[in-house]
């Protein structure tokens, strides 16, 4: 992903578009990155299967567009989606945070009944636009 991104942006004048927040809690810049041809780098990484959607409310301006790109990459078997391998059968999602957890994860047990969503696979969770919890790392072969 890093090399692909570098090939896209190196030597280019890019435009940054900010959403509701300009930085995350760690001081990192949150932005949509556009190339001179108008294409969105974030979307190109998703289409290549080199990234997955990781929403951070309230920064959801392009969430449907980006999720559509992720779903297309999944459907076409691009990048990380090419040789998908499921190891576990059930995951718990949190509708409020759009994160999913392994069933035995302490964070999964804390998800309220109102926000609890059960997925039969990681694939189903990603397809629904959820991203993996960083507490229990239900990633399988997907690198962070």
What feature does the model see in each segment?
Residues 1-144:
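Small beta-barrel nucleic-acid-binding modules, primarily SNase/OB-fold domains
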């Amino acid at each position: 992903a890093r090399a692909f991104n570098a090939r896209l942006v190196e030597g280019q004048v890019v435009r940054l578009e900010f959403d509701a927040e300009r930085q995350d809690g760690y001081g990192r810049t949150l932005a949509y990155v556009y190339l001179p041809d108008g294409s969105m780098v974030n979307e190109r990484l998703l289409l290549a299967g080199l990234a997955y959607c990781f929403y951070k409310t309230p920064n959801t301006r392009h969430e449907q567009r980006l999720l559509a790109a992720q779903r297309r990459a999944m459907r076409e078997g691009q990048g990380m989606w090419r040789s998908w391998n499921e190891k576990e059968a059930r995951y718990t999602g949190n509708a409020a945070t759009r994160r999913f957890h392994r069933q035995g994860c302490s964070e999964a047990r804390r998800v309220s009944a109102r926000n609890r969503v059960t997925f039969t696979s990681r694939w189903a969770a990603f397809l629904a636009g959820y991203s993996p919890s960083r507490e229990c790392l239900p990633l399988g072969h997907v690198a962070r």
